[in-house]
């Protein structure tokens, strides 16, 4: 794969075009003409000649030639969460036809970190050795700390920090993928950045250099399952979406429980539900206040289980607030 990464958006929207036009309009026109020749004439011609029938996309993100990418056509790179410091919850409101890049950083797990930082005196995210293995420098460390303390309570030590950073990353990308899939058919694709690493480093990867799965990798495996049962609060209502990437229709039993953390069931609902192939639709909606039956949002979570006609169970949990605001029992 030859990947033209963000070149058109960079030229049009990152100030490059304006700056070079200000210096030399003729030179700027030449750059754009060469760009058009390479990505809209030469390369698609090569693909047609040597791989007829192969899909060609001139840039990513891209919607129309000579225009910035947007939310109504083509694909979109979304980095307001992470680089832009927007809250993770913003994933639930962002739209696109195809989210082709977004991500959230984490460190490798403790056992992997010990491979390149074996001494306890280096077990600090700003130690010299840890900084040498941070893809985004201290700016990225600051973002991790900011997001972590916004969503979770302060970790007790370095090892706990690494673990909670993994869960934070997994929560963020799970939130994004579920939102994108609920938007079907308006949105028909979601690709997170990134899968793995070429060296041991803090990065956006879901598997570290040594092949160890981060929490994110487990989360996305489930979030990308052929059927997704996803709960979300919209306005005053709790809604449960059934999303299917299967081509055929299916049916099964949907169970919803609002549970306290000691296992007490506050509210229960169950029904036989049909799910259309290649579709997303709301299969349950009710006022959240009614479901809570007087319970505080921080003392409960929503559990949904869908059992299809073959007996396979799809399960998902949903918290009604930030993790630091949940009243978890001490263990």
Annotated model-derived regions:
Residues 5-6, 33, 58, 101:
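Residue-level detector of functionally special positions within alpha-helical transmembrane segments
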Residues 1-2, 191-193, 304:
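Extended hydrophobic secondary-structure segments that form protein cores and membrane-embedded regions
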Residues 1-32:
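Active-site groove signature of glycoside hydrolases
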Residues 310-331:
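Short beta-strand elements
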Residues 237-286, 296-307:
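Beta-strand-rich binding/interaction modules
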Residues 163-165, 207-208, 272-278, 291:
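Short, contiguous acidic/charged loop-to-helix segments that flank catalytic cores in large enzymes
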Residues 13, 27, 38, 42-51, ...:
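Substrate-binding clefts and catalytic carboxylate motifs of secreted carbohydrate-active enzymes
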Residues 18-19, 114, 257:
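Residues in and immediately flanking transmembrane alpha helices
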